[in-house]
């Protein structure tokens, strides 16, 4: 495992340096939005510390934060490749409770706590296990970042995104920029986005839609 992590680190930092590490260039927009030397991010459904990641470009610029994923192997990657962050292996939901995880492989960006999403993506070919989940507020409260305002919040929870969002006390942590997936719509038009429950939830809380990609959308306050 150590050799595997080492090879990934060498490849990404010395041979294949990139301008963007996100799926659709989200990190370029995020970097331009803040233009600051250091900041605080929270990434839920972080999956991989370098690949398809919206916070690695910020990490390289001396930002730090919290990475959360339901895969213990993903968090092993983060602990090795991003040791300056707090990396937590836990599920996130709107209550501290036990929920069912639906998965095919231990490390996959498609693992989900949402049964409908699992049926849609995996058909009937998936495994199940019970895991403990916590609210996002509870998770942050129990770190050194308790009470610290979030500069950038990233949520990629495979159909569980709204539940994760609702589990954060926005009045306490006040994220300036939120990137979140509307996984049931690929490349949606503006009317479709505006009908989505996540859009309505954030607009009511004084956020404005400022960027849209194939799945991800960014809201700023």
Where are these regions (language model features)?
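Phosphate/nucleotide-binding beta-alpha loop and adjacent structural elements of enzyme active sites
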Residues: 1-221
């Amino acid at each position: 495992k150590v050799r595997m992590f080492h090879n990934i680190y060498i490849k990404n930092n010395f041979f294949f340096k990139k301008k963007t590490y996100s799926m659709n260039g989200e990190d370029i927009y995020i970097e331009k939005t803040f233009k600051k030397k250091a900041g605080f991010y929270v990434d839920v459904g972080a999956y991989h510390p370098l690949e398809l990641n919206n916070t690695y470009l910020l990490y390289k610029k001396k930002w730090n934060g919290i990475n959360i994923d339901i895969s213990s192997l993903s968090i092993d990657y983060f602990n090795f490749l991003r040791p300056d962050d707090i990396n937590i292996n836990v599920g996130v939901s709107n209550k501290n409770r036990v929920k069912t995880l639906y998965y095919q492989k231990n490390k996959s960006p498609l693992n989900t706590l949402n049964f409908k999403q699992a049926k849609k993506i995996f058909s009937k070919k998936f495994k199940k296990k019970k895991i403990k989940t916590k609210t996002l507020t509870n998770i942050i409260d129990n770190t050194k970042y308790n009470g610290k305002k979030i500069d950038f919040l990233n949520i990629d929870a495979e159909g569980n995104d709204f539940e994760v969002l609702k589990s954060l006390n926005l009045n306490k942590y006040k994220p300036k920029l939120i990137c979140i997936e509307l996984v049931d719509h690929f490349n949606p038009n503006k009317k479709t986005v505006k009908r989505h429950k996540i859009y309505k939830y954030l607009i009511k809380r004084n956020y404005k839609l400022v960027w849209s990609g194939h799945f991800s959308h960014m809201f700023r306050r």
